Design a protein with these regions (language model features):
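Hydrophobic alpha-helical membrane segments
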Residues: 1-283
Length: 283
């Protein structure tokens, strides 16, 4: 595919948001199954990537623990649930290679994921970074203001603290998760800007609240399981979640009206793109 194809696209005629498909409540479990299949087909690349992310999350958590408190650490771990798309971008490229019958190469995946789309990804990362920093600061403030410091806290005081902290976190979580659920896969898949990708993601989440709540619960469960296993479980769980996110994007978002990238892994369609799964009508 030449670069002239994308140059000829009249971007003023492109829709502001890509339509989405209506998902069944159990669709996220199908994404997980496909994610496990990708892990099996690319075990070495997946585990190396998962190890790197697990070490990063573990290191940040330890710093938060020793320099702050366990409550700050839990707040930062909550933030990782919604920053996960940034850490999984390279995994999307591995899934895309597998779909096209290519042997996945980790260096090529990282180059395709970051170097080719660095502009839009940098804007998206900056937005998430600001939200994450505000979230982290909010966790510190909530701990300082709400956590009882006089003697042993009562059950009522602890419940009040946890309820208030959870409410504050839920506000940040809802906004960030909606914006990040499908944004980065779309940026890597099609030649779109960050605003279009974010609005498309929010639209898809709002129109599929049930399925996305299930998906969010799966992500939180995976992170909790990773923490319980001293972050060792994340070595496997991060790749599965990353691959599942890519398949979830492909099942949910109809980005066919937007141009493909002129070069790179996703410049060409996957051979069986029209027959791999039955899609519901777009909404």
């Amino acid at each position: 595919m030449s670069k002239h194809r994308n140059a000829a696209v009249d971007r003023d005629r492109l829709p502001f948001v890509a339509p989405c498909r209506k998902l069944s409540l159990w669709a996220p479990f199908r994404w997980i199954r496909l994610g496990v299949a990708d892990l099996i087909h690319a075990p070495q690349q997946s585990l190396v990537y998962g190890l790197a992310v697990a070490v990063l999350i573990g290191a940040v958590s330890l710093v938060a623990w020793f320099r702050g408190s366990q409550w700050i650490m839990f707040g930062m771990l909550g933030g990782f649930v919604f920053l996960a798309p940034l850490t999984c971008v390279g995994l999307y490229a591995i899934s895309a290679q597998l779909e096209r019958g290519q042997e996945p190469v980790l260096t090529r995946s990282l180059r395709a994921a970051f170097k080719r789309h660095i502009g839009n990804e940098a804007v998206f990362a900056l937005v998430l970074l600001v939200i994450f920093l505000v979230w982290s600061r909010a966790a510190v403030i909530v701990t300082a203001v709400m956590y009882p410091t006089d003697g042993d806290p009562t059950t009522t005081e602890l419940i009040s603290f946890l309820a208030f902290g959870s409410g504050v976190g839920a506000i940040f979580a809802a906004v960030t998760f909606s914006a990040s659920a499908f944004s980065l896969p779309m940026i890597m898949h099609r030649d779109v800007d960050s605003v279009t990708a974010i609005v498309t993601s929010v639209n898809a989440v709002l129109r599929n609240k049930g399925a996305m709540i299930v998906w969010l619960a799966i992500i939180i469960f995976a992170l909790a399981l990773g923490v319980i296993t001293a972050f060792v479980g994340l070595i496997v769980l991060i790749p599965v979640i990353g691959y599942a996110t890519w398949h979830g994007y492909e099942e949910t978002i109809d980005a066919s009206e937007f141009p493909r990238h002129s070069e790179g892994i996703t410049a060409t369609p996957r051979p069986s793109a029209s027959s791999t799964m039955e899609h519901d009508p777009v909404i």
